[in-house]
């Protein structure tokens, strides 16, 4: 399969821009119309799978909640395992935890301590790359577990927030749709 401009346009057409949400001046990129439309969701998953096909990885890690959609699909398509990065207190066994900075405060992600065996190559997958905090935290979880990051894949990148810069420490960063301008459709 080849990722065509037509495929990207099909995906882009299903991402709804919602002005002033969650606060004035913010344009929220709503992917629920894409997920509600079977052919568009299929196109998005196929395109992400194709974009990451050349990467060598053993598992996929994704963060709740929307990241689970694309992480699960990529793990399934590549016949690889899936590691769930959860908010604190959601996993029942021993965990490895990483805290990261948000615009206003901090947050944390956790994985089971045995989810990523040493030497495992892991693909970081999420729906959105914004400031890079969540993605960077997933990379840190992989490395803290003794694994290595094979690459990072996103459906959408908000390029104007420069989250990619937090990930360019040797990681391949792939995004299907990049909004370079906060007001762009």
From Swiss-Prot:
Signal peptide: none annotated. The keyword Glycosyltransferase applies. One of its GO terms (biological process) is AMP salvage. It holds the Pfam family Pribosyltran. Its main location: cytoplasm. The keyword RNA-binding does not apply. CDD domains: PRTases_typeI. One of its GO terms (molecular function) is AMP binding. It catalyses: AMP + diphosphate = 5-phospho-alpha-D-ribose 1-diphosphate + adenine. InterPro entries: Ade_phspho_trans, PRibTrfase_dom, PRTase-like, UPRTase/APRTase. Keywords: Cytoplasm, Glycosyltransferase, Purine salvage, Transferase. GO terms for cellular component: cytoplasm. It is found in: Cytoplasm. Its EC number is 2.4.2.7. Pathway: Purine metabolism; AMP biosynthesis via salvage pathway; AMP from adenine: step 1/1. Belongs to the purine/pyrimidine phosphoribosyltransferase family. Catalyzes a salvage reaction resulting in the formation of AMP, that is energically less costly than de novo synthesis. HAMAP family: Aden_phosphoribosyltr. Homodimer. This is Adenine phosphoribosyltransferase. It comes from Rubrobacter xylanophilus (strain DSM 9941 / JCM 11954 / NBRC 16129 / PRD-1).
